[in-house]
Amino acid sequence: MTLFEKILAARGLTTRAAREEFLHPNYASVKHDPFLLPDMRKAVDRLKKAHAEGEKIVIYGDYDIDGLSATAILLDAFGKFGFKEVGAFIPNRFVEGYGMTMGAVDKVRNMGADLIVTVDTGSLCHAEIEYASSLGIDTVVTDHHNVAETPPPSVAAVNPKFPGHKYPFRDLCGAGVAFKLVQALQTELAGLPDGYEKWLLDLVALGTVCDIVTLADENRANVYWGLEVLKKQRRPGLKALMSVAGIDPEKVNARHLGFGLGPRMNAAGRLETAQYALDMLTASDRLEALEASEKLEELNIKRRSIQDEIFDEACQQADNMTDDRVLVVNSGNWNHGVIGIVASKLVEKYKKPVFIIGERGDEATGSARSFGDFSAADAVRAADDIIIKGGGHGAAAGVTLATERIDDFRRRVNEFYDSLQLKNQELYLLPRADVEIDDFSEIDEELIDNLAKMEPFGNGNAEPILKITEATVLSVRRMGAEGQHVKLTLRDKNDVALQMLAFNAPEEFFREVGDEVSAWFQPTVNEWQGMKSVEGRLLHVSGV
């Protein structure tokens, strides 16, 4: 077996048919009947009425990339279907906050809405939808988030998380559900012939990758073909944003969406308003697209600077909490839109669960990131009598509490951690190799070309990781303005050498020449001044 075949086998792809299906996703074979989703029939019927009567539709999106992508999908498709009046409302994180709110419903009423179509939100907005109804505004919900025992009082609630339906795949993102609505409308309205909906897959791919849903079944095919659509550069906004981000459209992959386009789009909603990102997605000409993209780039640079400041301040606090098993850091000067990213970076550095809390007068709001067997949501529940509200899931949660109760909250979540008597939690943060190797003989361009066939990478299909079980450190080079990056050259048992690079490397990566080590890495190709070289993206290193 070749190394590539071993990697495929490690992913459970042991037969020729399974490999073929995985490496060449078939859009048609996973284009499941949209009418199997709950309430899709009701949603289509209500939209047909709006179409026939020329009603004003307002698409109510979320300010994250999934919500923005879903909003852009419906704006594009509804235009082609010939809906007479269609607008969009994206809430501001710092004004309306997350989800539907009463104030936001008032703003939508002032836009003249007869019908609200939510995307990526709405399943838990019972009171707000009831309020809209009292104002004479119907609501069609399209969403993918968790649901309550009773559906919202909307005309329709299309969400694969609702029980009792026969749709075969439940892990669609908001953009994916919006796309299913488009597919359903195609069967009943003219304007977007069968097959032409595939030109929307660039937006579906963007939402799917950035919302970190499982890249399997329909999601994998949508992203696979969505990347092909992106390469065609039919959307001026995404073409301009790729240019600003330095992404070659012919080589665009899922990593570029998650780490190139995604952060730039998110910066708008984190610092000012996500409307800038929607303006980019819906730009109709090159100049408009470039202006919107440059605005996103400017905000992203500002976001990075703010993020670095918060991280440094949080580290100063965390350095004085060496005995705490859960880090709870807080300040009145931290931007609420950025603290979630900082929480993730603190977990990486300190290898502990983290709550980062921004104070706003008497009330404070925080984000949590965790790992392993310590559930952030369970920790919030353990402090239920201390907080105002909170929730989430194992890896991430949010919490709102009185500022004066932060110290009590810190004590409570640490007591909760101790009560669990957890062991070896840090092991969950270590990379897990798909295959172990004892030499570098197959680490070449052919392998990297083959690994690219496994794209798109993301949740449920991570980039393959290899572990060299024993190698000798030939050289160590510190890089970067502060020596924060490292380039190791490792030699295998056959005297074959491979360079490995790690950015912002922890101190244990800086080994001594002659050390015998094991290393976890991802093979990559480095292109510099027209020259190609195979190297490794170093993820972890330990003594043999």
Predicted features and spans:
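Short beta-strand micro-motifs in enzyme catalytic cores
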Residues: 364, 397, 484-488, 532-534
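Short, acidic/hydrophobic/Gly-rich beta-strand patch recurrent on exposed beta strands
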Residues: 329, 487-492, 501, 536-539
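Accessory interdomain/linker segments of ATP-dependent helicases and helicase-like nucleic-acid enzymes
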Residues: 437-498
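Beta-strand/loop nucleic-acid-binding surfaces
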Residues: 493-511
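OB-fold single-stranded nucleic acid-binding module
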Residues: 405-411, 513-544
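Hydrophobic helix-and-loop "lid/oligomerization" segment in the mid-to-C-terminal part
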Residues: 2-115, 135, 187-411, 418-425, ...
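Histidine/acidic-residue-rich, glycine-tolerant segments that coordinate divalent metal ions
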Residues: 112, 119-172
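Short alpha-helices
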Residues: 73, 150-191, 197-209
